[in-house]
Amino acid sequence: MSGLGRLFGKGKKEKGPTPEEAIQKLKETEKILIKKQEFLEQKIQQELQTAKKYGTKNKRAALQALRRKKRFEQQLAQTDGTLSTLEFQREAIENATTNAEVLRTMELAAQSMKKAYQDMDIDKVDELMTDITEQQEVAQQISDAISRPMGFGDDVDEDELLEELEELEQEELAQELLNVGDKEEEPSVKLPSVPSTHLPAGPAPKVDEDEEALKQLAEWVS
């Protein structure tokens, strides 16, 4: 390749990393920055202790410790910002990867559904449902024909059967009434036989005294 081509970037472009590779690289960088945060926090605490140690005894050494502490705090703030940016970028790639996978799945599902219905239309469905309904009706008619009794009972007069049934009911009712009458009839009372010997005569009844007096008076008058 000529130097001019390399200068204007017309050469073959390298293939970029996959989302998975980018996410993995970001995670590794995040781990490095987290370790740097821990290191800077330790240095800040050390310089703070140094400044407290010298205090007013060695003002110059105390000020130098505070200056170093300030620089470490600035580096820590930069590291915090960088780490936040990397985390945001990694989450964005993860979300994009998830969304892309969801879209691919939806596309495959749509293609599969389209393939499943490519030989179908509403007219064919209606025709199929009509055929199914007709076949169900035929099946029902066949079932009815099979279950219908054959060879007897078709020429029997229904009115004649009802009349015969009514006669049987009347006979049964009359028999029930007869049975009730027999149960209600009282059994005859058997009287004792007349004795063959004469009973002794009882004492003669006493004549009323008034009648006797009237009889005597009538005889006296006559």
Curated annotation (Swiss-Prot):
Predominant place of localization: membrane
Subcellular location, record wording: Cytoplasmic vesicle membrane; Late endosome membrane
Residues bearing the modification Phosphoserine: 196
Coiled-coil ranges from the UniProt annotation: 20-105, 155-180
GO molecular function annotation: ATPase binding; identical protein binding; lipid binding; protein homodimerization activity
Any one biological process term the GO annotation gives: membrane invagination
Alphabetized UniProt keyword annotations: Coiled coil, Cytoplasmic vesicle, Endosome, Lipid-binding, Membrane, Phosphoprotein, Protein transport, Transport
Alphabetical list of InterPro entries matching this protein: Snf7_fam
Expression across tissues: Widely expressed. Expressed at higher level in heart, kidney, liver and skeletal muscle. Also expressed in brain, placenta, lung and pancreas.
Domain of life: Eukaryota
Segments for region (Intramolecular interaction with C-terminus): 1-150
Keyword Kinase: no
Protein topology in the membrane: Peripheral membrane protein
Stretches the record annotates as Disordered: 1-21, 180-211
Chain intervals for the UniProt region annotation (Intramolecular interaction with N-terminus): 151-222
GO cellular component: amphisome membrane; autophagosome membrane; cytoplasm; cytoplasmic side of plasma membrane; cytosol; ESCRT III complex; kinetochore; kinetochore microtubule
Region (Interaction with phosphoinosides): 1-116
Domain notes: The acidic C-terminus and the basic N-termminus are thought to render the protein in a closed, soluble and inactive conformation through an autoinhibitory intramolecular interaction. The open and active conformation, which enables membrane binding and oligomerization, is achieved by interaction with other cellular binding partners, probably including other ESCRT components.
Function recorded in the entry: Probable core component of the endosomal sorting required for transport complex III (ESCRT-III) which is involved in multivesicular bodies (MVBs) formation and sorting of endosomal cargo proteins into MVBs. MVBs contain intraluminal vesicles (ILVs) that are generated by invagination and scission from the limiting membrane of the endosome and mostly are delivered to lysosomes enabling degradation of membrane proteins, such as stimulated growth factor receptors, lysosomal enzymes and lipids. The MVB pathway appears to require the sequential function of ESCRT-O, -I,-II and -III complexes.
Family assignment from sequence similarity: Belongs to the SNF7 family.
Subunit structure: Probable core component of the endosomal sorting required for transport complex III (ESCRT-III). ESCRT-III components are thought to multimerize to form a flat lattice on the perimeter membrane of the endosome. Several assembly forms of ESCRT-III may exist that interact and act sequentially. Self-associates; overexpression leads to the assembly of filaments that curve and associate to create circular rings. Interacts with CHMP2A. Interacts with CHMP3; the interaction requires the release of CHMP4A autoinhibition. Interacts with CHMP4B. Interacts with CHMP4C. Interacts with CHMP6.
PANTHER family, sorted: CHARGED MULTIVESICULAR BODY PROTEIN, CHARGED MULTIVESICULAR BODY PROTEIN 4A
Protein name in UniProt: Charged multivesicular body protein 4a
Source species of the chain: Homo sapiens
